[in-house]
């Protein structure tokens, strides 16, 4: 088969790769659409791969074309997305249902062959069926949607309160939508890109704020009557927005860090005192899994994609390339300011 093979740093090529074979308990999926995740970028451009050669890709959708021995709930022709985490199921965290914290996990698209290929073989329990009326490109967004709702679950989100979304990338927009689905009183989205803010508005934000404006914090405070936001979800993984979360939080707020920073983050004594005096609850959120595996995050995404309440907008996708042009797609990330949304790879 053909695949996008990473042979070394900045050396990703559309090349021949051994077609994976189905084993007991697995299914083979013909990949129709697969998104480039932010975590793929350092693996390709910044020496972040675990080994070479490797086929990356973990946000995908496609059709089941072969079913391994012992698989009962999947059939040839089923449309599926894939949960990329492959937990050991034996360590203490797995036994408690904390699969994302597994000590001995594998991961489709980084530690084993991923979806930047014509075919991928995955454990049957990782294949998430969805209604075939959902377009492949939308279904390739399963994983970022589940990351978003996992953050809400980690923050014990219950609705009926004010919500600040920091960062309007793919995960930020899904976080916004989940907050709205589950009854937010008011949602305000923050970003530096007017195009992303326009998308946030279309997806249900009550107000949007460009943080490049000098008076943005004053306006943000006016919206809540200077009470702060009862729920703050940081999705950008940027030290600026992570510190901003502390300033926007209300007394007794829930603050959740979903984004992952790639540079050092320094908390000043003033910021720390801000947290202490407000007595807000700060939590991290890692991946998107719960018991029974892969979890309600995946079931809820399938359901709300089907009902149409969890929306897909063409604005999610910045560029679309055939898999054969994968090197061209990753070249854009050498200047991240060129990329304003998800880059989607497709197989004809």
Segments and roles (model prediction):
Residues 20-34, 47-92, 131-134:
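Glycine-rich beta-strand-centered segment in the early N-terminal region that forms part
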Residues 221-222, 226, 265-317, 328:
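C-terminal substrate-binding/catalytic core of Rossmann-like NAD(P)-dependent dehydrogenases/reductases
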Residues 1-3, 243-247, 296-348:
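C-terminal hydrophobic helical "lid"/dimerization subdomain
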Residues 155-158, 203-281:
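Glycine-rich cofactor phosphate-binding loops and adjacent beta1-alpha1 units
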Residues 117, 192-199, 266-271:
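Short, glycine/polar-rich helix-capping loops at beta-to-alpha or helix-loop-helix junctions
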Residues 7, 18-19, 51-57, 75, ...:
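Short Gly/Pro-enriched turn/cap motifs at secondary-structure boundaries
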Residues 134-214, 218:
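Mid-domain Rossmann-like dinucleotide-binding core that forms the NAD(H)/NADP(H) cofactor-binding site
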């Amino acid at each position: 088969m053909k695949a996008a093979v990473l042979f070394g740093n900045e050396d990703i090529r559309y090349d021949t790769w051994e077609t994976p074979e189905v084993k007991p308990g697995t299914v083979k999926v013909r990949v129709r659409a697969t998104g480039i995740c932010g975590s793929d970028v350092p693996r390709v451009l910044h020496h972040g791969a675990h080994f070479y050669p490797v086929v990356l890709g973990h946000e995908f959708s496609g059709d089941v074309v072969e079913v391994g021995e012992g698989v009962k709930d999947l059939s040839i022709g089923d449309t599926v997305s894939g949960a990329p985490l492959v937990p050991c199921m034996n360590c203490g965290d797995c036994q408690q249902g904390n699969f994302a914290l597994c000590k001995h996990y594998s991961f489709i698209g980084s530690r084993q062959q991923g979806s930047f290929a014509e075919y991928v073989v995955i454990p049957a329990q990782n294949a998430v069926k969805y209604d075939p009326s959902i377009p492949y490109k939308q279904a390739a967004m399963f994983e970022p949607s589940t990351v978003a709702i996992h953050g809400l679950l980690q923050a014990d989100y219950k609705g009926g309160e004010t919500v600040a979304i920091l960062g309007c990338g793919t995960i930020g927009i899904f976080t916004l939508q989940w907050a709205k689905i589950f009854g937010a009183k008011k949602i305000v989205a923050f970003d530096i890109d007017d195009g992303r803010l326009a998308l946030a508005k279309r997806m249900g934000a009550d107000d949007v704020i460009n943080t490049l404006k000098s008076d943005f914090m004053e306006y943000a405070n006016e919206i809540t009557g200077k009470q702060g936001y009862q729920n703050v979800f940081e999705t950008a993984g940027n030290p600026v927005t992570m510190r901003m979360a502390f300033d926007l939080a209300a007394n007794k707020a829930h603050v959740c860090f979903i984004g992952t920073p790639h540079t050092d983050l320094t908390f000043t004594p003033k910021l720390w005192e801000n947290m202490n005096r407000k007595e807000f609850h700060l939590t991290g959120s890692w991946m998107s899994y719960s018991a029974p595996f892969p979890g309600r995050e995946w079931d809820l995404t399938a359901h709300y994609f089907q009902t149409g309440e969890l929306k897909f907008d063409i604005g999610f996708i910045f560029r679309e390339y055939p898999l054969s042009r994968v090197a061209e797609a990753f070249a854009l990330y050498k200047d991240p300011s060129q990329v304003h949304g998800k880059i989607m790879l497709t197989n004809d």
